[in-house]
Amino acid sequence: MSKKKARWRKLDNAAKLYSAASNKKDTRVFRFYCELKEEVNPDVLQEALNQTIETFPTFLMVLRKGLFWHYLEPCNLRPIVKEEYKEPCSRLYIKDKKTLLFEVTYYKKRINFEVFHVLTDGTGATEFLKELVKNYLYLIHKVNGLEPVSLLPEDMTVQDQEVDSFLKYYSKDQKRPEKRKLHAFQIRRKKKDGNHLHVHESVVSVQAVLKRSRELGVSMTVFLTALFMMAINEEMSKMQKKKPVVLMVPVNLRKFFPSLSMLNFFNWIEPGYNFTTQDQSFEAILKYTKEFFETELTKEKMSAHISELLALELHPILRLAPLELKNLCIQAGAKYSEKNTTAIFSNMSAVKMHASYVPYIERFGVYTNTPKFELCLCSFQDKLSFAFTSRYDTVNIERNFYRLLKEQGIASEKVKPEFPKTDEPSEQEMKVYKIYSFLCIAIVAAMLVTEYNFHPRIRWTLFTAGGVVTMWISSSIGFFKRYNLLKNAMWQLFIGTIICFIWDALTGWHSWSVDLVLPIMSVSTLTAMFVIAKVRKCPVREYLIYEIMAAGYGLILPGILLLCKVVKNPTVSMFGALICFLFLVAVILFKGREFKEEMQKNLHV
């Protein structure tokens, strides 16, 4: 494979949705794992991971925010193999914190690969894990004569991995007829204690499922989709059956459009069945599901859906909306669209390894963190691994599903869950912050009550209350932006000057906030950023945009105030603006290429 360093890149269509909609509970992280027949050696696994990253440099990315969109940027971070230490599919992307978007852990005989959906999809994750497992097994067993093999095309390049296939196959002339979506039945159960992810796995024979599917004249996915809808239906009341059971079924678009991309490239279909108005027999449900798949799984339908998704993203007016506004709209849209589906059924298909490596592998498995009830499956050799995940007590649906499989002559074997005792995320920091906030509120309230009852001649109560509010705002910014000191400094500059403007106005406007505070804070912040970047040895791409913002703020705002004659004593303002101006000139002259790249990344639409 041809190797070349990855560069910064725009997010693909699906990644833009995931970056906006992910949160602490809905992490948009999924796990692909490999169960070996021997205990994992962590040192060898680390060496194998280092080799795998050389093959897939596109994974060494961090998520950054621009003015209009997020983007992915190469970083000098390297993944470190750890023993499994937290709940599966926990959050990988933490706002403002520079972290990789994937993680490799191990537990006993299992190698886990967890990844944020912004980085890749199921196909990309499969290829990464296969390469990792291959490298690991070779390093362990080469002394026994195991030969090195290649799992990827020899002429595959990094550019192939980075292709945005959504854009490649987008055609603005393709349009899909609009369908009115009905609200689907929603699975609602009491949440588990602590809102932890609930994972139940079982294994069945691939040949048994294929044999029965062929007897019925349908594909494996159609067969299992019909059973899944029936399993859900059995838990619905008569009133609930007025709404259809609708499944979201992801579709790998590489089966329709040639692509070697490691980015997201998938679509979905939504088979739904109303068990009140339609025949409830298995034969009728299977027939409907088969016809639905045959109708929807065509190249024309997939192409039209791609065009529909991209048309919204590429709308000239919507593209110019600020990122934060886009995020709010995407989050609202994602919340609303949840009403259109009951559950998710994701078939990752068969994982294939070179024959010489097969004897060392027990099976592969996959599951994901989702706000919905989800069934994921993948196969290896004759083992088909099922994984039900949710944050609700919904074991009845799983029980129904496996019973229906048994009625079709397919036995299942429950997998005993093997997870270490995880480190619960510490809430101590947030508790301290809440106590601090309560004390600040108490002091402000006490000052206001004192002011109302005693009317002191020198209004020290109001000054004290204002000072406490100012201190709380400043420290809150520091707390929530603690992962990024440079962004923290920029926020402190922006909020700090605004607070000073307000104080100046409330005390009779003596102009000290614009004459002194604004230029001094701007230059001080710029200096602090420079020192932080040097001390921490930050790459240019990590600090330059913040220094440009601080210098621009210290130049443009005082300039406007000088022109409007708001500044009474212009000396300090002019010197501050001069320093900021010279800094920007120096950046353009000595860091021109980096300056241009930062502008492209942060202003791309």
Where do the language-model regions lie?
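Generic alpha-helical transmembrane segments
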Residues: 463-473, 491-503, 514-531, 554, ...
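Non-catalytic, low-complexity flexible loops and terminal extensions
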Residues: 2-13, 102, 110, 119-127, ...
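Membrane-helix interface and helix-disruption motif detector
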Residues: 444-466, 481-487, 502-521, 539-542, ...
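Acyl-thioester-dependent acyl-group transfer interface
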Residues: 1-67, 77-103, 234-415
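Short, highly charged, low-complexity non-transmembrane loops/tails of multi-pass membrane proteins
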Residues: 595-605
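Hydrophobic alpha-helical membrane segments
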Residues: 521-531, 542-563
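Central hydrophobic cores of alpha-helical transmembrane segments
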Residues: 226, 489-496, 544-554
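N-terminal topogenic module of multi-pass integral membrane proteins
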Residues: 416-468
